[in-house]
A protein has these predicted regions:
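C-terminal alpha-helical cap of glycosyltransferases
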Residues: 344-360
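Donor-nucleotide binding loops and adjacent catalytic segments primarily
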Residues: 170-247
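Active-site and donor-binding regions of nucleotide-sugar-utilizing enzymes
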Residues: 9-158
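A nucleotide-sugar donor-handling region in carbohydrate enzymes
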Residues: 119-188, 212-213, 328-335
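Short acidic-hydrophobic, aromatic-tinged amphipathic segments that line or gate anion-handling sites
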Residues: 60-65, 234-238, 304-315
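A short, charged/proline- and glycine-enriched loop
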Residues: 2-8, 96-97, 170-174, 200
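Catalytic binding pocket for nucleotide-activated donors in carbohydrate/polymer assembly enzymes
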Residues: 145, 259-335, 340
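A donor-sugar binding/catalytic signature common to diverse glycosyltransferases
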Residues: 81-83, 90-101, 239-287
Length: 360
C-alpha cells in the first residue's frame, strides 16, 4: 500500500481551468493522498468564484497578480504546482517545487503545442498522438500521456447534468448545446432570431469565458443576451463555469473548432462544426495566413469528428439529420476523439495522482 502523500497548489489564472483541475483534486482526496490549495486571482468575477469555493469546499488563497502568486509559491514550497498555461516566473519554480502543466482543453489552436516552449517538470498530455508530437518538438522535456481528466466525472457517473425543468426547459424536447469559442467565433454569424429556427429543441448556450468577460467581445454579449430571452434557451451564467454538466445533459453539440467538439465526440454524441466564422479584417483575404498560423494542422481533423456546416443556412437540416441518426458516425467519431484526446476510461485523474506520488 502506498502511504506517500503530496502537497499541491493549483494556479487558477482563469476560472475555466477549474474543470480540468477539480477531477485531479477529487482523486487526491479520494485516495487520501495529500492536500491541495487553489490560488485564485482577483478579477471581475470574485463573487462568483467565492460561491464555487464554498460549494467545492476548497482550501484557497487570493492573489492580485502573478508576481504575488510567485511569492506565495516561494514561501509555501509545496511538492507540485499545477499551471494551466505559461507562467512568467517558471524558471524560479524548480528551486522550490516541481511544476505541472495541465492544459484546459484539446482544441486546434497552435498555442496548444507552443505553450510548452517554457518547460515544466512534467506536462500531462491527452493521448499518444499529441504526446509524440510534443516529444518531437521539445525532445529534452518530459511529457506523460494520461488521457483527458476533464471527462472523468461524466465517464464515472459522478456528473448527472442539469434538471431541465429547473432551467425552464421542456423534458420532452431534444436538447442542443451551442458552445462557441471567443475567436474566431461563429456567434456573430448567427441571426438574432436563431432560437426561433430551433424552437422544437431546448438550447443550452455555453459561450467561452472571454466572450462574457472581455470588452472587445461586447457584440457577442449583446447577441447572447438577446437569445437568452427565448423560452427554449438557457444561457450559461458566470458560475456555470464548466462545460461538463452541459455535455452530460445535451443530445447534440454545435460549436466552432474548439476543444468542446472533441470532448463531446468522446461521449459518442453527434457534433456539428460551424465552419462559418466572423474573422477580423486582418485575418481575411491577403491576411488569411494569420488565421492558418493561429490554427494547428489538427484543425483539419475536425471534419472527421463532426459534421461540417459551411453556412448558417445549412445548420437546421444537419441538426435534424444528426438528431434522427445519432450513431451514424459513431465509429469514426470515437476513433478520432481518441486520437486527439487519448483514452476515455475515467482514470486519467488517477494516473496523474499516481505519477505525482511516484515522482515526488
Amino acid at each position: 500500500m502506498n502511504n506517500k502523500t503530496i502537497s499541491i497548489s493549483f494556479d487558477v489564472q482563469q476560472l475555466y481551468y477549474l474543470p480540468q483541475y477539480l477531477p485531479v483534486y477529487h482523486r487526491l482526496l479520494k485516495q487520501n493522498a495529500g492536500h491541495a490549495t487553489f490560488v485564485f486571482y482577483h478579477g471581475i468575477h470574485d463573487a462568483f468564484i467565492k460561491n464555487i469555493i464554498q460549494s467545492e469546499n476548497l482550501d484557497h488563497i487570493w492573489v492580485k497578480d502573478k508576481a504575488e502568486a510567485n511569492k506565495y509559491y516561494k514561501n509555501q514550497k509545496v511538492d507540485w504546482i499545477f499551471f494551466g498555461n505559461t507562467f512568467p516566473f517558471l524558471n524560479e519554480i524548480p528551486q522550490i517545487s516541481k511544476s505541472v502543466q495541465l492544459g484546459h482543453g484539446v482544441g486546434p489552436k497552435a498555442s496548444y503545442y507552443t505553450k510548452s516552449s517554457t518547460p515544466t517538470t512534467v506536462r500531462f498530455v491527452e493521448g499518444e498522438y499529441r504526446t509524440n508530437r510534443l516529444k518531437n518538438m521539445y525532445p529534452n522535456d518530459n511529457f506523460v500521456n494520461v488521457g483527458f481528466c476533464k471527462l472523468d466525472p461524466i465517464i464515472n457517473g459522478e456528473t448527472t447534468g442539469f434538471d431541465l425543468n429547473q432551467l425552464g426547459l421542456k423534458t420532452e424536447k431534444k436538447t442542443l448545446i451551442y458552445a462557441p469559442t471567443f475567436y474566431p467565433s461563429s456567434i456573430e454569424r448567427f441571426p438574432k432570431n436563431f432560437p426561433e429556427s430551433f424552437s422544437t429543441y431546448n438550447i443550452l448556450i455555453k459561450p467561452h469565458y472571454f466572450s462574457t468577460s472581455k470588452d472587445k467581445y461586447k457584440k457577442q454579449r449583446q447577441l447572447l443576451s438577446h437569445w437568452s430571452n427565448y423560452d427554449n434557451v438557457y444561457l450559461a451564467k458566470v458560475d456555470d463555469y464548466s462545460l461538463v454538466p452541459f455535455m452530460a445533459t445535451a443530445d447534440l453539440l454545435i460549436s466552432d473548432a474548439s476543444s468542446a467538439i472533441i470532448e463531446f465526440a468522446a461521449l459518442d454524441k453527434p457534433v456539428i462544426w460551424c465552419n462559418f466564422l466572423k474573422l477580423r479584417w486582418n485575418y481575411r483575404g491577403i491576411f488569411s495566413y494569420r488565421f492558418k498560423k493561429r490554427m494547428d494542422k489538427d484543425y483539419n481533423e475536425y471534419s472527421n469528428i463532426a459534421v461540417r456546416a459551411d453556412s448558417y443556412q445549412e445548420l437546421k437540416t444537419i441538426v435534424a439529420e444528426q438528431v434522427a441518426n445519432p450513431h451514424a458516425l459513431s465509429k469514426t467519431r470515437l476513433q478520432y476523439a481518441e486520437k486527439l484526446a487519448g483514452t476515455f476510461d475515467g482514470n486519467a485523474s488517477a494516473r496523474i495522482i499516481d505519477y505525482l506520488l511516484n515522482n515526488k
